[in-house]
């Protein structure tokens, strides 16, 4: 299943994407708002990639390898929908991470719209959520641009900064498009 947007080419993540996953998730800059920090080594990236591949097999959706349509062989990010317990009632999570070289171009917003379209139109989901560090203003703006509303906050033991919980239901998404 491949999705193309105005500028993006999205395809299910594959084992051949390991080097790209490691380059993006091992970069400390892409983890400025993630207290867990960057992936420590390529073996850790492999373990994460293996879990993402299993999620595709189990659920029929998961992280996409994100490329520009003009260069579909070059992975510039990963993101999509995953089953992840957000809080007591929400378990479908929108997430994304892009290479620093493409930050500030509106690609996260374009990916978020595509993921929401896919989730509501193809998967027939009722609700999609996202969590973001409360101080990650750029990512919060992305979620707000696609119509997600903040519905709560999560405090995490050992972390000074909590996460904001955003959500959108299918009907609201239809009115945003």
Predicted regions and their residues:
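Active-site rim helix/loop that mediates acceptor-substrate recognition in acyltransferases
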Residues: 38-60
């Amino acid at each position: 299943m491949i999705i193309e947007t105005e500028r993006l080419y999205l395809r299910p993540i594959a084992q051949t994407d390991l080097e790209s996953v490691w380059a993006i998730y091992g970069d400390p800059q892409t983890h400025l708002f993630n207290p867990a920090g960057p992936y420590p080594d390529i073996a850790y990236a492999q373990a994460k990639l293996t879990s993402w591949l299993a999620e595709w097999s189990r659920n029929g959706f998961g992280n996409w390898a994100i490329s520009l349509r003009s260069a579909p062989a070059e992975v510039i990010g990963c993101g999509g929908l995953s089953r992840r317990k957000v809080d007591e009632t929400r378990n479908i999570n929108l997430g994304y991470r892009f290479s620093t070289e493409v930050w500030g171009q509106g690609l996260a917003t374009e990916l978020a719209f595509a993921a929401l379209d896919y989730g509501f139109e193809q998967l027939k989901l009722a609700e999609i959520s996202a969590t973001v560090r409360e101080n990650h203003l750029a990512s919060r703006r992305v979620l707000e641009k696609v119509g997600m509303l903040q519905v709560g906050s999560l405090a995490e033991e050992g972390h000074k900064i909590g996460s904001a919980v955003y959500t959108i239901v299918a009907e609201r998404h239809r009115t945003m498009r």
